[in-house]
């Protein structure tokens, strides 16, 4: 973080300073990540109140506290009405001090892939900061912005949400030059209520654009009519591997089990791209990243080089060669209807006997059964050879697939999966489920067993 004094923060955050005025160059909300002299922000959540950990923060080396009430502790304290809001305001101030060119993105699925692709491209152009992991909520976005320093030329900020208004808040802190909605699908329906609710929440990202900013959206499933009032007269770019009239599209597509080759078509010209990631949906992700990067000046050569240097991310269609002719695709990090059906299409293009291993999709509310059935029907239409499921909801996937088996626990599923592997000369297995399903346990079991 750039250096700032407590007296400066008092003005920035409209707070009250008690104690000495010191200079700060680091901030944390986690007592496990304290650095000497840092500012400890005492956030209050539904299940915790970090004010209770102030003594621990002092013992760990914190130099000052950001609190919502005075504490009986010998440390300088900046007292504000709401530490969560103040944390965001501090991040917004840091963002305003740094001249880096900033882009932001959201979507129902593929956010992390697009973020990684965009960061890889912009890293060809200059020093690039990007969201670590999935720190994309109303706490994670400020954490990322606070890492900005004058050394950065670019920043790629991922915005997520599970309720209305969250992205409107985080994009107001981020102030991007360009903003992208990667796609829309049934995700977090418990918080949004419907796909229309998802669209409204994702469209909030465009409210943070300046008048000369660029709104970027997927031409295949955008919600343009509802977003038009938010976008106003700002420039709009559309991307799609399917729509030839899009601003960013792909031609000459050639898909293999290890990656994709295609010609990227853009408003400034075309370039041949080698994308070392499996799946047609990653072509759309690459188009999104190309558009987002080009909005802040990336060249075609930078786009080509950045995409070519990509590495697969564990848990996100990460290829694991169990043995010769035995390929495991670890897509266990998370799941919703959109990413599940995309994974089905990836598996459909893989060699040998194709097995889809699924856990539950979470946070779908009243639409849960219908969404799980939709994935099963997609597997059936794609010709997947076998579907194995585990969990409370995923039986709907295996049943709808017509080639499914459901298991009471992962141990039974893994036993069956090992038998299938032993029976097949060539096999590809794709493992996927929501974070709460912990399907990485299946992946680990197969890896530990080697050739099974």
Swiss-Prot record:
Domain of life: Bacteria
Enzyme Commission no: 6.3.2.10
Any one Gene Ontology molecular-function term assigned to this protein's record: ATP binding
InterPro entries the record matches: Mur-like_cat_sf, Mur_ligase_C, Mur_ligase_C_dom_sf, Mur_ligase_cen, Mur_ligase_N, MurCDEF_CellWall_CoF430Synth, MurE/MurF_N, UDP-N-AcMur_synth
Places the protein is found: Cytoplasm
Record-linked Pfam families: Mur_ligase (PF01225), Mur_ligase_C (PF02875), Mur_ligase_M (PF08245)
Binding, ATP: 107-113
Enzyme class: ligase
SUPFAM superfamilies: MurD-like peptide ligases, catalytic domain, MurD-like peptide ligases, peptide-binding domain, MurE/MurF N-terminal domain
Keyword Membrane: no
GO cellular component: cytosol
Catalytic activities: D-alanyl-D-alanine + UDP-N-acetyl-alpha-D-muramoyl-L-alanyl-gamma-D-glutamyl-meso-2,6-diaminopimelate + ATP = UDP-N-acetyl-alpha-D-muramoyl-L-alanyl-gamma-D-glutamyl-meso-2,6-diaminopimeloyl-D-alanyl-D-alanine + ADP + phosphate + H(+)
Keyword Zinc-finger listed: no
Quaternary structure, from the entry: Monomer.
Entry's family note: Belongs to the MurCDEF family. MurF subfamily.
Function: Involved in cell wall formation. Catalyzes the final step in the synthesis of UDP-N-acetylmuramoyl-pentapeptide, the precursor of murein.
PANTHER family referenced in this protein's UniProt entry, alphabetically: UDP-N-ACETYLMURAMOYL-TRIPEPTIDE--D-ALANYL-D-ALANINE LIGASE (PTHR43024:SF1)
Protein name (Swiss-Prot/TrEMBL): UDP-N-acetylmuramoyl-tripeptide--D-alanyl-D-alanine ligase
Organism this protein belongs to: Escherichia coli (strain K12)
High-level lineage: Bacteria, Pseudomonadati, Pseudomonadota, Gammaproteobacteria, Enterobacterales
């Amino acid at each position: 973080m750039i250096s700032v004094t407590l007296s400066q923060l008092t003005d920035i955050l409209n707070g009250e300073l008690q104690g000495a005025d010191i200079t700060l160059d680091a901030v944390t909300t986690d007592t496990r990540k304290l650095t000497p002299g840092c500012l400890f922000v005492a956030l209050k959540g539904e299940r915790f109140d970090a004010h209770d950990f102030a003594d621990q923060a002092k013992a760990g080396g914190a130099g000052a506290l950001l609190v919502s009430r005075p504490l009986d502790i010998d440390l300088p304290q900046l007292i504000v009405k709401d530490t969560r809001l103040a944390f965001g305001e501090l991040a917004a101030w840091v963002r305003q001090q740094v001249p880096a060119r900033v882009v932001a993105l959201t979507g129902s699925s593929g956010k992390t892939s697009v973020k990684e692709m965009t960061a890889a491209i912009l890293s060809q152009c200059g020093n690039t900061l990007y969201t670590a992991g999935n720190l994309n909520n109303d706490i994670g976005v400020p954490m990322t912005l606070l890492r900005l320093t004058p050394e950065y030329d670019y920043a790629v900020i991922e915005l997520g949400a599970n309720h209305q208004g969250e992205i409107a808040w985080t994009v107001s802190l981020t102030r991007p030059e360009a903003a992208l909605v990667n796609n829309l699908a049934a995700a977090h329906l418990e918080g949004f209520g419907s796909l229309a609710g998802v669209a409204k929440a994702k469209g909030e990202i465009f409210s943070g654009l300046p008048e000369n900013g660029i709104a970027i959206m997927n031409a295949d499933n955008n919600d343009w009519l509802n977003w038009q009032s938010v976008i106003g007269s700002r420039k709009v770019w559309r991307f799609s591997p399917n729509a030839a009239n899009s601003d960013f599209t792909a031609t000459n597509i050639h898909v293999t089990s290890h990656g994709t080759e295609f010609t990227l078509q853009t408003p400034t010209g075309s370039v041949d791209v080698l994308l070392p990631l499996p799946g047609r949906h990653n072509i759309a992700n690459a188009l999104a990243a190309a558009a987002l990067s080009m909005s802040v000046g990336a060249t075609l050569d930078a786009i080509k080089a950045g995409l070519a240097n990509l590495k697969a991310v564990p848990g996100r269609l990460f290829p694991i060669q169990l043995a010769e002719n035995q390929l495991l695709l670890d897509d266990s990090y998370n799941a919703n209807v959109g990413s599940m059906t995309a994974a089905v299409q990836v598996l459909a293009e893989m060699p040998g006997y194709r097995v889809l291993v699924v856990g539950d999709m979470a946070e779908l509310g009243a639409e849960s059964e219908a969404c799980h059935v939709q994935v099963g029907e997609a597997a059936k239409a794609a010709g997947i050879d076998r579907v194995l499921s585990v969990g409370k909801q995923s039986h709907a996937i295996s049943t709808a697939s017509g080639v499914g088996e459901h298991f009471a626990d992962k141990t039974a599923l893994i036993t069956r999966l090992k038998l299938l592997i032993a029976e097949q000369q060539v096999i590809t297995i794709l493992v996927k489920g929501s974070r709460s399903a912990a399907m990485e346990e299946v992946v680990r079991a197969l890896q530990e067993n080697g050739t099974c």
